[in-house]
Swiss-Prot record:
This is Glycine N-acyltransferase. Its EC number is 2.3.1.13, 2.3.1.71. The keyword Acyltransferase applies. It comes from Bos taurus. GO terms for molecular function: glycine N-acyltransferase activity; glycine N-benzoyltransferase activity. The gene is GLYAT. Belongs to the glycine N-acyltransferase family. Pfam families: Gly_acyl_tr_C, Gly_acyl_tr_N. It is found in: Mitochondrion. The modification N6-succinyllysine is found at residues 15, 126, 140, 168, 255. The modification N6-acetyllysine is found at residues 15, 126, 140, 158, 255. Signal peptide: none annotated. Keywords: Acetylation, Acyltransferase, Detoxification, Mitochondrion, Transferase.
Amino acid sequence: MFLLQGAQMLQMLEKSLRKSLPMSLKVYGTVMHMNHGNPFNLKALVDKWPDFQTVVIRPQEQDMKDDLDHYTNTYHVYSEDLKNCQEFLDLPEVINWKQHLQIQSTQSSLNEVIQNLAATKSFKVKRSKNILYMASETIKELTPSLLDVKNLPVGDGKPKAIDPEMFKLSSVDPSHAAVVNRFWLFGGNERSLRFIERCIQSFPNFCLLGTEGTPVSWSLMDQTGEMRMAGTLPEYRAQGLVTHAIYQQAQCLLKRGFPVYSHVDPKNQIMQKMSQSLNHVPMPSDWNQWNCEPL
């Protein structure tokens, strides 16, 4: 195991991961944030350097004090060799399997590795598999070979106009975390609320405020640079409002040089159509999350 330290190593890692997009996207986005201030205080581990086969991004041990907090106890993994990956993840200094944790990756082949480890280390695992989307602008910049112009929507990728008297674009405030938490599919508890508050305080997030000055639609970003937790109050749905929050956030990220990507549940046809209307393109790899609990 090798801990990457210093700006030069992390920049080399980012450059190397770029060659493996979109399979490495979750890890690539996380390393980009580490190279821009590292707001979540993460660390990068590789099996060897510089010719690594497996990379794991994880929090510092001192930040993982709550054994039940899988939002904090999150690992991002990319590997070019599954046998090597299983051996690397098996190391206690790489992953603390005694905790409730989650592993995220845009690499579906890791499922076999994690299921094998679940059998040998006695933990139960729940997998969430979703459609991975990347903005066409990001694809053009990072992986132009993936961009099939024939399949792009005809539109300009901009949302329809909304009534400026009714809705005002704003940033998300920490006081808005509770409403985001209430409607987040992976949230709804105290630990997820703390995670959302941390994301709001650390990254650019956007919302639409209604006439009462409270959020009616929003889009946030997590420590991997992914746009997540987007939602709209039920009484304001079917108006295309969330499209505005996501569009503004995407423009902000593009200006900063970050990849624009997100995931959508395969059953959520509405958000799939919304993603395509913004010229976000489904990727050949999936978005994966494995929630692991020791037995």
